Amino acid sequence: MNLTPKEIVKFLDDYVIGQKKAKKIIAIALRNRYRRMQLSPELQDDIVPKNILMIGSTGVGKTEIARRLAKMMGFPFIKIEASKYTEVGFVGRDVESMVRDLANAALNLVKNEQREKNKDKIDEFIENKILEKLLPPLPKGISDEKQEEYKNSLEKMRTKLRNGDLDESTIEIEISQNMFDTNPNLPPEMGAMQDIVKVIGVGSKKVKKEMKIKDAKNALKNEAGEKILDQESIKSEALKRAENEGIIFIDEIDKIAVSSGNSNRQDPSKEGVQRDLLPIVEGSNIQTKIGTLKTDHILFIAAGAFHLSKPSDLIPELQGRFPLRVELDSLDDKALYEILTRPKNSLLKQYSQLLKTENLELEFDDEAIKEIAKIASRANEEMQDIGARRLHTVIEKLLEDLSFEADEYAGKKFVVDKKMVEEKLGDIIENKDLARYIL
């Protein structure tokens, strides 16, 4: 999608309140990708993305900015926590697995696009598979009259299948099953091994299962995709997308920084994780299920609160790989008020729509919204600052009784006013000890 930086920021304004500096920097970084692709191949190789370091408390919009943009522009995107990785030689996930995760995200993205383009062919394949079970093909040598009867019965059955009239009927189908897909107890570091065995086919077998037709339609989608879609071209496109459009969002980067003033209490493997991360951010070749993936042009966005450490506590080489830095603003009561009212699918709209399913019309008057924002802001100031996430806790507590008794208000309109907010939350916010547990 070809959008100018101004258009990108305008799109983000519908979902993320404030944070103009962060939006501007990311918009420019994404536009530079488009600009790079317009150049000669020789020059493209020399232009590497300027990685971004976002500094700010939790809940201020760091992840949301990157996630929204990636989804809107159709870019492969993954979010990982730096603190979940371990140095090579230690038990746990190694940093290369984040690149394999990005490859999987790109593969799923391209597969879904191709499935949508070939939806009619896939639906027809699934229909024919199910119809074969419902009405087995006639043997050879059958009279023309019998063949015509069979054809008519088949079309009637096809119509019923498409209309959903047979959804509750049960059939037995044969589907492929991989032993790794069905074992939830495998450790995450087995990811590479899973990729290998899937490629060579070890551990895969056909199993027969009885299920309702509506479930069989979903179960046969993968098989339909494997048969109809060109798997090699999908892998090739996914590799290209991951290399040139991929975004890896590394959260909690501050958790692997080694504070100089408190070095004796640090985990010695933290610096090791940084050093393992360095070649990936600099550019290296990683083996994945879709081929060898070059990380040179992946955009890395690192983020952290940096309450107990500073960006300068990261190793110098890694600092140099994140040249663009932006500090995100904390959210005051005015910003929280805008978060409750401005976004397309604001939190208040979500709650109203949820209760609408109970035939209850829920409204918030303006003074009530301002009071909710003030209480959330005060809770953030007096306790740990968790940004906009505090609004979820405050509104859940405010609407707890109404949600529980929603059926009693069916067919009615319920207006939340300032008085109700004060009655439900006033005593809690005044009692600091109680507020720490509830809000």
Curated annotation (Swiss-Prot):
Record carries keyword Heme: no
**Keyword annotations from UniProtKB, A to Z:** ATP-binding, Chaperone, Cytoplasm, Nucleotide-binding, Stress response
- Briefly, what is this protein's role? ATPase subunit of a proteasome-like degradation complex; this subunit has chaperone activity. The binding of ATP and its subsequent hydrolysis by HslU are essential for unfolding of protein substrates subsequently hydrolyzed by HslV. HslU recognizes the N-terminal part of its protein substrates and unfolds these before they are guided to HslV for hydrolysis.
Annotated binding of ATP, by residue: 17, 59-64, 251, 317, 389
Q: Which SUPFAM superfamilies match?
A: P-loop containing nucleoside triphosphate hydrolases
GO MF, one annotated term: ATP hydrolysis activity
Disulphide linkage map: none
InterPro entries according to UniProt: AAA+_ATPase, ATP-dep_Clp_protease_ClpX, ATPase_AAA_core, Clp_ATPase_C, HslU, P-loop_NTPase
Q: What is the lineage of its organism?
A: Bacteria, Pseudomonadati, Campylobacterota, Epsilonproteobacteria, Campylobacterales
How is the subunit organization of this protein annotated in UniProt? A double ring-shaped homohexamer of HslV is capped on each side by a ring-shaped HslU homohexamer. The assembly of the HslU/HslV complex is dependent on binding of ATP.
GO annotation, biological process:
protein unfolding; proteolysis involved in protein catabolic process
Gene Ontology CC entries for this record: HslUV protease complex
The protein, known as: ATP-dependent protease ATPase subunit HslU
Question: Transport: present as a keyword of the record?
Answer: no
The family assignment reads: Belongs to the ClpX chaperone family. HslU subfamily.
Highest rank taxon of the organism: Bacteria
What is the annotated localization of this protein?
Answer: Cytoplasm
